[in-house]
Amino acid sequence: MLAAACAVAAVASGAAAGSSKTVPNWAAPQIATVVKHKLMGATSVKKFKPNAALTHQTLANLASDLQDQLGTPPVPEYDSDPPTDTTPGTTTTSTTTTTPASVSNPAGHQTMTQLDRSLVQAIGLTQAAKEFVQGARAAGVAVPSRFGTEVVARLLGLRLNHPAAQDYLELRPQDPATRAEAAYSAAQILSFGELDESSQLAQVQSLADGFVLPQLNAWQRRILAVAFSKIGMPYVWGGTSDGTEVDFGVTARGGYDCSGFVWRVFKLQRYPNEGDLASTIQGRTTYTMSVEVPRSKRIALKKLQPADVIFFGTKGTRSNGSQIFHTGIYVGNGWFIQSSDEGVALAQLTGWYKNRFAWGRRPLREAGLEP
């Protein structure tokens, strides 16, 4: 369930981003599904061109065709904020459906953010995306314009975490999407089945309807704003940055592993009048972060507050430090934010996660920034 990078694992080196090495056809099963359903203009798997950039025309056609196949009504374009991460278009050969959707720049390359936004619209979850944005902003937390659609896309499993040795395949929200990424997402959507009250789409809408954050103090808002600003960044083994890093011999454009995400928010990020906040967390790994806090200061599940760092162990609350394998940041009302298989994403502290919750720590209190 969690990305392997949260546990001890060997990492083989991979090709660097932008190298001449042919990218593996990692989405072959999903591409076959897309071709079978006559999506994205491809007539065969062999002619699909998975590593080509996704164009505006192809994405518009895909969204329209998914609406037709799923029976979802057309929805207005998602507009929580004007788009801010559009990639300038360049001329690219594009395949289209028989009746192409009308777009202003057919050959323009589409970003990962634009891919997720279009697909969330196509499956009728625009309102859900807006409700996640509204829930955060109502609590005074600033969020990027992509926040709602990225939360929804990841709750639906529309993104794939590539193996650590292939972290060069990971794409940031602002990076041009590939046809393979679009095919993976489309195949996931087609797997949801009937659109009834028990469907995955209906469940995500229900979660959005109830998304409310508790009252936050100023420091909690600052911490969550930084954490939320990373929504949609990919999971990268050893990653701690939005920018290019070489982690364990693999060049990645940017991203975070579970402890790297917490490290960025509390250790590397600078805040006005932060006092000793950056020195509260000393260790870089999940294990060291978890054992730095004495047992008497560990936070139980029922006592969690927003901006607490939370840890998960193989034996839940009976875990010791050596059994801790994952970490995240508590958001409030049963939600937390993490970097895992879905990249940086919101998740509910229920079920599998609740059973493995070990303890939390409160860096804001440790730094003397709140009682």
Where are these regions (language model features)?
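Feature responds to low-complexity, polar/acidic, surface-exposed segments characteristic
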Residues: 1, 13-28, 40-60, 64-149, ...
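Bacterial N-terminal signal peptides
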Residues: 2-10
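Solvent-exposed, polar/charged alpha-helical surfaces in well-ordered, non-transmembrane soluble domains
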Residues: 28-36, 57, 61, 113, ...
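Aromatic- and glycine-rich peptidoglycan recognition patches
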Residues: 182, 188, 278-290, 297-302, ...
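Non-catalytic ligand/cofactor/substrate-binding and regulatory segments of enzyme domains
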Residues: 194-235, 356-371
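Catalytic cysteine-centered active-site loop
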Residues: 236-306, 317, 355
